[in-house]
Amino acid sequence: MSRRQPFRYVLLLIALLTPGLISGCATPSRISAVPSEFTAQAQPSIPNARFFPDRNDPQLIAEAVRSLEKERAWLKAGGHTGPLPPAVFLTISGGGGDGAFGAGLLSGWSETGKRPNFKLVTGISTGALIAPFAFLGPEYDPILYETYTQTTDRDIFKRRNLMAAIFNDALADTAPMAKLVDRYITRTLLDAIAIEYAKGRLLMVGTTNLDSREPVYWNMGAIASSKDPAALDLFRKVTLASAAIPGAFPPVMIDVTVDGVRHQEMHVDGGTTRQVFMYPPTLNLGRTSKALGATRQRSVYIIRNARLDPDWASVDRRTLTIVNRAVSSLIQTQGFGDLNRMYLTATRDGVDYNLAFIPRDFTVKKTSEFDVNYMRPLFERGRALAIAGYPWSKYPPGYDPADAAEVP
């Protein structure tokens, strides 16, 4: 979710001004939601397709173990007999058009010849659009360049008229973005992801289940590897859902079953519950690795597609301006919390922490969310920083290791 989306919270004003109209008119229909007592049992048609990080999900731990077993088997087949090689994780945050920064950084990193082959790649919102191509490597950088230097608002959404916005499920129609996703997310792409998944590499995308109000991590490698006819559609739906800003963009309805009974879950932008994620602290990677004899060097590279310094502005005394500014502040603060949680988890587990973000001196202004006159220079800035050797921050914003050392 970006900090600059001027129409994002118009829905709130509509709800305040027209309660009688809204309550008296039909809304889009849906299949019944999963009853609260069965949410943990609900499954899409593809096994092992997702995890619930806030529930200490044992399936997530089991997937980590399987990943290690597959990696060891692949290394052995290739003649590797020494210790496990370093594991490098990549996490890509939300940010709308600001995703051009991350796309440029990855492209520049490729040009240096030093970009790692990531063991784990995760993405939220715009990061979910980048993640599959980052996972597959530099060969797919041209897609990132095209997407984040040529895409405009009309390639992502169409604004609905006022009445449609009031009585439908969002202010805008994301049919254009669905076409973009269909263009790039193909069966061929899934086959390439499946090959890497078989080597023990993991690709995860985050959404938010709005019915149960919890984050969901989707195991995109397992989905890609599935022979289920619905695999391609589910992969596309998850990608679209991760970027579905609540109120602005329509939610994505995902079919699940409980004891053979069909239900639907409403999924929206993963940034509603996480701006960026690595793995849940409950996994305790350090302890698990020791138990499995899998001690190795690990590092995480976090791309936060946002500025981290205060974005000063003189706020007009207008309802929508105030709402937008306040909620943008909440999103920024949530992002800080995510970065701190990841730092604490990484420190506990012996994972080297590295953070990139849009620099303070990038001052180009945008006129819309996907403004190519903003995204192109942002892409080039990220690329140039990577080529020069990005100065990765070793700590989250506001953290002073000297102060931490003084705590008794």
Can you annotate each of these PLM segments?
Residues 2-12:
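Bacterial N-terminal signal peptides that target proteins for export
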Residues 130-133:
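Hydrolases whose catalytic domains are alpha/beta-hydrolase-1, hotdog thioesterase
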